[in-house]
């Protein structure tokens, strides 16, 4: 706060990508190879997600985690992500690192993912090597493993926002659409490969005997894939850094209407005014006569309170998109998090609570294995569908894709719940892939279109001498969408267990997923705003 004027501190940043004043520079068209390299981060992330889905439950059970702490493991990560996601998204909008705004955050979160995997896949081995007291070993093993799971989930959920914002910053609108389709394609391929490797019995293979256990084998593959994918991703497309121009320019006169300035300070997204290449157009200064170059960014000193107020004041069409994303992820996670358990108990009629050498438990394990193959089918079909999405858009538009994704998933899960047959269930897993591809592409395409429309409006206002008052950074908008994933995890983790206990059967899981998806159909058709 400046004591002499009573106004909040204001810093101005300028993108090194632009030189001329009053001109908005369109990023160059990106070759397919660069977009594929950019998508490798999604491949690596989803590969590690699949490994976690296949191994985290056996790992937690092997270290003796009490059932009372099981829900804590799955709730801690989304709660932390929901609270911190917008903060990091906003901070990345005005990061001044020399190699860009998004890549430093992506690198840090990638390292956190690697550390989380190291802890939850090797926690028991680490503790056995460090602690000799058998009475202390279980407590430390549980603590280390839980920390690893929470850290990995937190970073893996978190990283989606900066990756999407990175794509939006450096690409034209057409390349953004292409990039999102490649993201969905490689997300499915990464998940499929992760599930396939998780289905192999490494204990009876030479590599398993060499590394010790199948947990160490999967850590070897996961760390190798994740490291290579993120190196390729970070080298895919250069980012233009922001530089601080406050030291190079004389102080400006304070606005004549401080109250108006104070009100704008808490508008949605007003905590950062990013002008980095294609991200934002011309900026008209308050006062009317002087304009900043379009590559400038005005950043006010922010607090958590101001950030929350900014998010609460988001425009209606952004809010509706976030709600539809929340409904979609609630439906999707309701099914995916409990699908293998549904296969073991309902489809195969096994019993997870019986003795481990009993026929009922072995049948349950067989159902879980087949459920993993169903998730593999989901990943493969997600990749295929993401490829065909580009061909479908000219005919049905984004509205048709959004509606169709929710509808097919709702009908597919409903059919599985009503007719729990092995073969029909595996066939219906293709509808999971449609929903997955839809959630990873359409909402972010809409965000890109909203920003493109706002850029055109702001450019027209700047040419006409008007005042630009509705600027947002794409990092914050992507983070707001990603927050809905964490909120959906909180709702599913806290609510579905209660429903299962009340009903007495896990069939309520797929019925809930179906109902939520069909409600989402109505919402995306009636309330989400689409741009032709």
Swiss-Prot record:
InterPro entries: MFS, MFS_trans_sf. CDD domains: MFS_SLC45_SUC (cd17313). It is found in: Melanosome membrane. The keyword Cell membrane does not apply. Residues 67-68, 127-138, 206-216, 341-367, 421-426, 501-506 are extracellular. It comes from the Eukaryota. The chain crosses the membrane at residues 46-66, 69-89, 106-126, 139-159, 185-205, 217-237, 320-340, 368-388, 400-420, 427-447, 480-500, 507-527. The keyword Coiled coil does not apply. GO terms for cellular component: melanosome membrane; membrane. It catalyses: sucrose(out) + H(+)(out) = sucrose(in) + H(+)(in); D-glucose(out) + H(+)(out) = D-glucose(in) + H(+)(in). Signal peptide: none annotated. Gene3D superfamilies: MFS general substrate transporter like domains. Belongs to the glycoside-pentoside-hexuronide (GPH) cation symporter transporter (TC 2.A.2) family. PANTHER family: MEMBRANE-ASSOCIATED TRANSPORTER PROTEIN (PTHR19432:SF88), SUGAR TRANSPORTER (PTHR19432). This is Membrane-associated transporter protein. It comes from Sus scrofa. The gene is SLC45A2.
């Amino acid at each position: 706060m400046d004591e002499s004027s009573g106004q909040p501190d204001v810093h101005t940043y300028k993108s090194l990508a632009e030189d001329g004043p009053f001109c908005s520079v369109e990023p160059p068209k990106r070759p397919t190879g660069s977009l594929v390299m950019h998508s490798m981060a999604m491949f690596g992330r989803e590969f590690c997600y699949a490994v976690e889905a296949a191994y985290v439950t056996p790992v937690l059970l092997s270290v003796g985690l009490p059932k009372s702490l099981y829900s804590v493991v799955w709730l801690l990560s989304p709660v932390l992500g929901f609270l911190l996601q917008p903060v990091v998204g906003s901070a990345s909008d005005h990061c001044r690192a020399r190699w860009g705004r998004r890549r430093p955050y992506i690198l840090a979160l990638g390292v956190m993912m690697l550390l989380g995997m190291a802890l939850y896949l090797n926690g028991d081995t680490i503790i056995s090597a460090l602690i000799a007291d058998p009475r202390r070993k279980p407590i430390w093993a549980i603590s280390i493993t839980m920390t690893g799971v929470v850290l990995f989930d937190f970073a893996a959920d978190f990283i989606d926002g900066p990756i999407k914002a990175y794509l939006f910053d450096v690409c034209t609108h057409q390349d953004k659409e292409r990039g999102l389709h490649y993201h969905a394609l490689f997300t499915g391929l990464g998940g499929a490969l992760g599930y396939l490797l998780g289905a192999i019995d490494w204990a009876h293979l030479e590599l398993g005997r060499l590394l010790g256990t199948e947990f160490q084998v999967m850590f070897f593959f996961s760390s190798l894939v994740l490291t290579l994918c993120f190196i390729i991703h970070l080298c895919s497309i250069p980012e233009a850094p922001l530089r601080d121009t406050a030291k190079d320019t004389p102080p400006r006169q304070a606005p004549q209407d401080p109250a108006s300035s104070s009100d704008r300070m808490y508008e949605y997204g007003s905590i950062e005014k990013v002008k980095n290449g294609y991200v934002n157009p011309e900026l008209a200064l308050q006062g009317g006569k002087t304009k900043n170059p379009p590559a400038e960014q005005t950043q006010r000193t922010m607090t958590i309170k101001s950030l929350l107020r900014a998010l609460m004041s988001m425009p209606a069409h952004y809010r509706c998109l976030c709600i539809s994303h929340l409904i979609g992820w609630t439906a999707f996670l309701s099914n995916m998090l409990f699908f293998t358990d549904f296969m073991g108990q309902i489809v195969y009629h096994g019993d997870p609570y019986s003795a481990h050498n009993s026929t009922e438990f072995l049948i349950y394990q067989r159902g879980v294995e087949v459920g993993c193959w169903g998730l593999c089918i989901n990943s493969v079909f997600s990749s295929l569908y993401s490829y065909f999405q580009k061909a479908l858009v000219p005919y049905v538009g984004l509205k048709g894709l959004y509606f169709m994704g929710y509808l097919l998933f709702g009908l597919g899960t409903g059919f599985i719940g009503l007719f729990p047959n092995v073969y029909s269930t595996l066939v219906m897993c293709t509808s999971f892939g449609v929903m997955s591809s839809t959630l990873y592409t359409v909402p972010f395409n809409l965000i890109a279109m909203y920003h493109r429309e706002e850029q055109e409006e702001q450019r027209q206002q700047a040419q006409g001498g008007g005042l630009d008052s509705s600027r947002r950074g794409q990092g914050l908008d992507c983070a707001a969408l990603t927050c809905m994933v964490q909120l959906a995890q909180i709702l599913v983790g806290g609510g579905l267990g209660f429903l299962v206990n009340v009903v007495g059967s896990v069939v309520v899981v797929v019925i809930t997923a179906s109902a939520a998806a069909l409600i989402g159909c109505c919402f995306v058709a009636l309330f989400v705003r689409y741009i032709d």
